[in-house]
């Protein structure tokens, strides 16, 4: 069934978008490959922080440059995403450490423990793995927002070349605010759809407080919240970076 869905998706995408969609599909394939290599390297014992940083940069570069080509818009978006990823890494590590989000939760109805045939200690720093997970979750929203702001700012400057830097930043902020609600709603409904069945099954036997304090629920909720925060933070950063790159006659007519 999965193969059928993949084939249907690819055929419909190519029919709807042609060559442009083909590049998007190729970008997705590249990103899946990078993610698979990241998992394998972590499993083999490579430094989690370094491999995740390299993978995040490669995924960002593939998505922005391969799909949208190399120009002043994509360079601005790439730099903005990298800045937010660096800042977010420290914030994510702080949250995971103090919320004790690392480690296994419950897989189905089975808790990860030796009595169930599972090994709790797999020889990997689970705190760093959780940081890597949150960073990977964060990347998509950052890229979409940064590309939208930098592309919009580019068009504004192209049609109004006399705009000063403060006006350009304000325009970028306005663009970001317009797409913010859509991005946050998308993140929320991803979370709501994924955990609807779990919430129903939990509430059948446990209270709301037990549900909210469960590790599985908390991990996913905080991941979505961090993604939403990152989407907000990148708005002023993208606006500023775009203004720095595009303000002094760097935009072609």
What is each residue range found by the language model?
Residues 157-166:
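Juxtamembrane helix-boundary/capping and inter-helix hinge elements in multi-pass membrane proteins
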Residues 1-107:
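N-terminal transmembrane hairpin
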Residues 80, 124, 132, 136, ...:
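Pore-lining and gate-forming transmembrane alpha-helices of multi-pass membrane transport proteins
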Residues 42, 99-124, 200-221:
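Membrane-interfacial helix-loop-helix connectors in multipass membrane proteins
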Residues 86, 141-145, 179-184, 220-236:
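Hydrophobic transmembrane alpha-helical segments of multi-pass transport and channel proteins
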Residues 142-156:
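Short helical (or helix-break) motifs at transmembrane helix termini and adjacent helical loops
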Residues 165-177:
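Helix-loop junctions and hydrophobic alpha-helical segments within the transmembrane domains
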């Amino acid at each position: 069934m999965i193969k059928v869905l993949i084939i249907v998706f690819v055929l419909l995408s190519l029919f709807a978008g042609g060559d442009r969609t083909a590049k998007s599909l190729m970008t997705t394939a590249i990103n899946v490959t990078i993610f698979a290599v990241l998992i394998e390297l972590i499993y083999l014992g490579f430094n989690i922080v370094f491999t995740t940083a390299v993978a995040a940069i490669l995924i960002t570069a593939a998505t922005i440059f391969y799909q949208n080509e190399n120009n002043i818009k994509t360079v601005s978006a790439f730099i903005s995403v990298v800045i937010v990823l660096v800042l977010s890494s420290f914030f994510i590590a702080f949250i995971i450490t103090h919320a004790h989000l690392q480690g296994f939760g419950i897989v189905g109805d089975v808790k990860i423990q030796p009595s169930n045939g599972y090994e709790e200690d797999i020889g990997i720093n689970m705190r760093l793995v959780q940081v890597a997970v949150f960073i990977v979750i964060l990347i998509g929203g950052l890229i979409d927002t940064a590309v939208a702001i930098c592309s919009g700012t580019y068009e504004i400057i192209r049609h109004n070349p006399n705009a000063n830097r403060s006006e350009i930043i304000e325009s970028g902020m306005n663009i970001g605010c317009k797409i913010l609600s859509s991005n946050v709603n998308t993140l929320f409904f991803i979370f709501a759809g994924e955990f609807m069945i779990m919430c129903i099954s939990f509430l059948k036997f446990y209270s709301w407080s037990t549900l909210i304090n469960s590790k599985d629920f908390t991990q996913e909720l905080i991941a979505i919240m961090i993604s939403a925060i990152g989407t907000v933070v990148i708005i002023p950063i993208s606006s500023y970076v775009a203004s720095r790159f595009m303000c002094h006659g760097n935009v072609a007519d």
